[in-house]
């Protein structure tokens, strides 16, 4: 499927997205106070300084993102008061995990992953303006990946490696 076709589908989905979100809110799968983040709108300001965006969809990928953030901190990143992490997730459970780490001193902000509509992703990127992005996930979000690579230079996709590591770790 081409990106044009994919975006046409997103334009059609825009019409039913509010109903879909309402059902997810009622079933407890969405944080009712943070739905705006799914549309690329944040109530939080971007901190001044360097911002590294780490994205992991669910708990397992968020654990990997936190491990990467901790490794970066051990190597000096985030210790001078002018370097931060933006951690994005898709699930409430992963968000709670990240929130606990932030309370323990991780210089980070958590946001929910924006929907993959090009306008939403652009709004998200315009607001956060990350200096670097690393996606630690197995899902594929065409607009998020494409627009991120056009927005910033330092971008990494670790989901292929995670699949390899998952097989290795699972066998140990």
Language-model segments: residues:
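Short hydrophobic helices that act as membrane-entry/anchoring signals
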Residues: 2-25
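Active-site and donor-binding regions of nucleotide-sugar-utilizing enzymes
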Residues: 18-172
């Amino acid at each position: 499927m081409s990106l044009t076709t994919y975006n046409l589908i997103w334009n059609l989905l825009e019409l039913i997205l509010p109903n879909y979100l309402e059902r997810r809110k009622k079933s407890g799968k969405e944080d009712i106070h943070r739905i705006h983040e799914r549309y690329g709108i944040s109530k939080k300001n971007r901190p001044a300084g360097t911002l590294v965006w780490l994205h992991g969809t669910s708990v397992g990928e968020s654990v990997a993102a936190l491990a990467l953030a901790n490794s970066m901190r051990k190597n000096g990143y985030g210790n001078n008061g002018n370097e931060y992490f933006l951690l994005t997730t898709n699930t409430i459970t992963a968000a709670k995990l990240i929130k606990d780490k932030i309370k323990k001193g991780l210089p980070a902000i958590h946001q929910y992953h924006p929907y993959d509509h090009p306008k939403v992703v652009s709004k998200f990127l315009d607001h956060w303006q990350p200096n670097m992005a690393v996606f630690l996930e197995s899902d594929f979000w065409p607009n998020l990946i494409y627009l991120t690579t056009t927005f910033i230079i330092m971008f990494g996709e670790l989901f292929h490696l995670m699949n390899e590591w998952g097989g290795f770790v699972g066998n140990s």
